[in-house]
Amino acid sequence: MLLVVIFGLVALFALWGVLRSVRNKNILGFLLAGATLFVFGWFTVMTVINSGYPTAH
C-alpha cells in the first residue's frame, strides 16, 4: 500500500504543478502536469477502490 501513498503524493505535486502553471500562464507545463495528475490520480483512486485502504487480505 506504500506504492499508493507515493503515487498519491505524486498526484498532489502534479496538482500543485497544474495550479502553478496556470498562474504563470505556462501552457506546456499545464499540459504535462495535467497529464501526470490524470494518470497518477486515476491509478491511486482505482487502486484504493480495488484493494481498499488499508489493503484487504
UniProtKB/Swiss-Prot annotation:
Q: Where in the cell is it found?
A: Cell membrane
> Membrane topology per the record?
Multi-pass membrane protein
- Main site of residence? membrane
Segments crossing the lipid bilayer? 2-22, 29-49
Q: Which domain of life is it from?
A: Bacteria
For this UniProt record, the keywords arranged alphabetically read as follows: Cell membrane, Membrane, Transmembrane, Transmembrane helix
Spell out the Pfam families in the cross-references.
DUF2759
- Which InterPro entries does the record cross-reference, listed alphabetically? DUF2759
Q: Which GO terms describe its cellular component?
A: plasma membrane
What is the recorded name of this protein? Uncharacterized protein YqgW
> What species does this protein belong to?
Bacillus subtilis (strain 168)
Q: Which gene encodes it?
A: yqgW
